[in-house]
Amino acid sequence: MEDSGIQRGIWDGDAKAVQQCLTDIFTSVYTTCDIPENAIFGPCVLSHTSLYDSIAFVALKSTDKRTVPYIFRVDTSAANGSSEGLMWLRLVQSARDKEEQNLEAYIKNGQLFYRSLRRIAKDEELLVWYGKELTELLLLCPSRAHKMNGSSPYTCLECSQRFQFEFPYVAHLRFRCPKRLHSTDANPQDEQGGGLGTKDHGGGGGGKEQQQQQQQQQQEAPLIPGPKFCKAGPIHHYPASSPEASNPPGSAGAGSAKPSTDFHNLARELENSRGSSSCVAAPGVGSGGSGHQEAELSPDGVATGGCKGKRRFPEEAAAEGGGAGLAGGRARFSERPLATSKEELVCTPQQYRAAGSYFGLEENGRLFAPPSPETGEAKRSAFVEVKKAGRAVGLQEEAAATDGAGGTAEDPDAGGGVAGGGSNGSSTPAAGSPGAPEKLLAPRPGGSLPGRLEGGSPARGSAFTSVSQLGGGGGAGTAGTAGGSGGGQTAASDERKSAFSQPARSFSQLSPLVLGQKLGALEPCHPGDGVGPTRLYPAAADPLAVKLQGAADLNGACGPLASGGGGGLPKQSPFLYATAFWPKSSAAAAAAAAAAAGPLQLQLPSALTLLPPSFTSLCLPAQNWCAKCNASFRMTSDLVYHMRSHHKKEYAMEPLVKRRREEKLKCPICNESFRERHHLSRHMTSHN
């Protein structure tokens, strides 16, 4: 009886949504310009907070008679395809038949778009209906007309309501017939597993009433193929017009399964089904040799134990196999949360099922989960999250550990509650091992879940995963992942680079070169102290002793360079010069003199700043030089760091030597003032 309560609450919420969206329902849209054929509009803005805010809203607006108090004129040639979508697409009225339909709704990239079916003239109303794929997806298959006494061509057999047009009639059968909805609410044993659930009916489990109801539904709809992409969601359970019509009359033992549709995930469901049209069949869980499909629907037409038109979730498969301890279809409502937030809607349908099961379910050592992207069994989708894939890998690595625990059936015929032959398929917790739920819900032996997620398989690489995290996959505590030996994985993962990972700084703590002596002392350079200005300038009288600390980092190497033993500069490293060997501004010279004479000392620049801008022969770009200390840099980022670390508060300590920048940085030709010296240098190149 809980199912009916859930559905009543959902329909009450939808009724409130209808009251809030009266403007959307009673507004017609007219175009102010001609629309060519195959013009595309969209995407349509849908929040998926209710049934009326999903892709089913077009069918829910369909009526025989229109009351249009609002007319909305739209310039369809305006900007299209914005990130927010087109708001007026929600206001387009539903077409009543194919003759007046001029727009077709279809799914692309998980979003709803409209396509013009013909040329639409100016000042013509836009009327939309679903395309062929969405019609099959929403189970809005056209039924044959039921004529009663030569009156209306379309009559509902449940409530005897008559319709003049096809599309409102189909929408009524699918969504709005009160007797159908009431029968769904009043028939809870179709969803409970205590007795003869819908998916647990055996060979003779049905009754005369169920057979009559099935025959009545077969009379309502023609023989058409069953829905390919019907997803049994945990929220809405609505009867379709022809769910079992494709089944032959010989399968009268199976009950009348009312397929249900999760309208919030239909868009991504359709997109997934296009990519993987061929379904991967898992080991059989039903009777005989009829196996269910792991990532798609259970096959229609299976007479014994088949869930016609419904998707088998991992919980349901375990309930039939005897070992999860969940009664029938109740696993859907108890274990799977309602998809309400937008974050939950981003998951793929396969991932939505796998994430909904909070415990792993194995059968003969195979995990009932969507094929992992690491093994190549499924294509990578834009909605797949690496964490979820890592969870599937973590569950697979312990599949062998829980194989012999007794919680899973060893073969399809040995399970206690497996539906087979003509027996009823009721599954109880006593059918399997008593400790099966505890073993399935127990913590995994391979360490904590965050550890497994962090260690993960080195084969998977996310653009947002740090390299160090990927590198730890081979050694920590995550041995036995689905990749191979740990050593090779570590070597392979160390070579991989991520575009979004923060690289290790090539300059150790950004201070590779340290001045050995103070700027004012100017002591002579000893032979073992590395490179001094005497080697660079033989005529220098007072050289600046410079000590190299980790100078190999400038070369790209890893080990530090020894300062003793007559060590010289490595190849391709920047040469070092004392600031006394090139001219500086008078303000800087006065500051240097004051620093040498008094206690006030300037911040010593690092050796990277001791490069003149004129040495272009050293492959140093001239534009990356500091205008305050004449230091040149290979990269602009180094110059930016230098300016922030050395010259941020430099002039705050020397108020006596400040000069106005307008006087100091002025073009001698055109007298234009500049704030920075390199701006003046660029300006001077224009005069050449």
From Swiss-Prot:
Family annotation (SMART domains): ZnF_C2H2 (SM00355)
GO biological process: central nervous system projection neuron axonogenesis; corpus callosum morphogenesis; corticospinal tract morphogenesis; methylation; negative regulation of DNA-templated transcription; neurogenesis
The SET domain, residue ranges: 16-131
ZnF (C2H2-type) intervals: 154-182, 624-647, 665-687
Start-end of Low complexity biased regions: 209-219, 275-284
Annotated EC: 2.1.1.-
Subcellular location per the Swiss-Prot or TrEMBL entry: Nucleus
Tissue: Expressed in brain, heart, liver, testes, retina. Highest expression is observed in the retina and hippocampus; moderately expressed in the cortex and cerebellum. In the retina, it is expressed in bipolar and amacrine cells.
Pfam family, any one: zf-C2H2_4
Sequence positions that bind S-adenosyl-L-methionine: Y130
Family the UniProt entry places it in: Belongs to the class V-like SAM-binding methyltransferase superfamily.
Function, as annotated: Probable histone methyltransferase, preferentially acting on 'Lys-9' of histone H3. Histone methyltransferase activity has not been confirmed in other species. Involved in the control of steroidogenesis through transcriptional repression of steroidogenesis marker genes such as CYP17A1 and LHCGR. Forms with BHLHE22 a transcriptional repressor complex controlling genes involved in neural development and neuronal differentiation. In the retina, it is required for rod bipolar and type 2 OFF-cone bipolar cell survival.
Protein name: PR domain zinc finger protein 8
Organism expressing this protein natively: Mus musculus (Mouse)
Gene coding for it: Prdm8
